[in-house]
Amino acid sequence: RVLLFEKRRLAAQELEERLPKGQRVADDERQSRFVPLRRGEQPSIHRFPRGPQPGTFLHGLLELAAQEGFATLQDAERCRRWLAPRCQRRGWGEWSDCLSDWLGQLLQRPGLVPGTELALGELPPSRYQSEMAFMFAASKVDVQQIDRLVTAMTLDGQPRPALQRDRLNGLFKGYIDLVLEHEGRYYVLDYKSNWLGATAADYSEAAMSRALLEHRYDLQYVFYLLALHRQLQARLPDYDYDRHIGGALYWFMRGVDAENGGLCHQRPPRELIETLDRLFAGQPVEEIDHAG
């Protein structure tokens, strides 16, 4: 089977400044929030510090685990030995056992791909690429037109913060946390460290959808899938969007103990991806006036 993979991480700064003040594309949590453990309270992933630095640390663990090989860290004792020094270096030694248990849950959680029992720890390195780079040109692409298209055809057309008027010029580039292949279908997987609440129940489908809308992750996963669409189109002779694209997996990692595992699956319609492909290629496109 053909795999695409080369090395590198997401930016999406090109669209960041088009959001109203206080809203940012592809942003998890900007504010650091540390709530000390009360005496006798056991650490849990729901109590782990929040903010950019802890979020980057959690993302980094998954990136390193991918490089190590997810399967190699499924052994609990090996995972603890691997994780402990990394926590110590950050001054989070008291969280080492908690994070080791949490990482084990992530690796062993079935249902990574919808309709399957696949777990992250079962993926061989030949079936995924961590931090995959993408890049494509933009010439006077209307940001608000992108916004209208994406809003109409994702998340049931629900309201979300609008992008400000502007045009994209130059190279649009970024990095995808993980691209994986399973049974001939390709998925983009993005790790999210957002804190949605203090319990597993706070990571409901509705809560995750609200987070997607609030942070405009719809734009993020649409561009990821556009990049994947273009790469597969170039490398698979028989490529077909409906057959080969599995969609976007958003993993709200603090909710791994929720009934749904904190996993959110989105798959925009072929029409949207192909329309955006033409738009970035400088071809005229028609507006889409229906929700999907």
Q: What are these language model-derived features?
A:
Residues R1-G292:
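Structural signature of nuclease core domains in nucleic-acid processing machines
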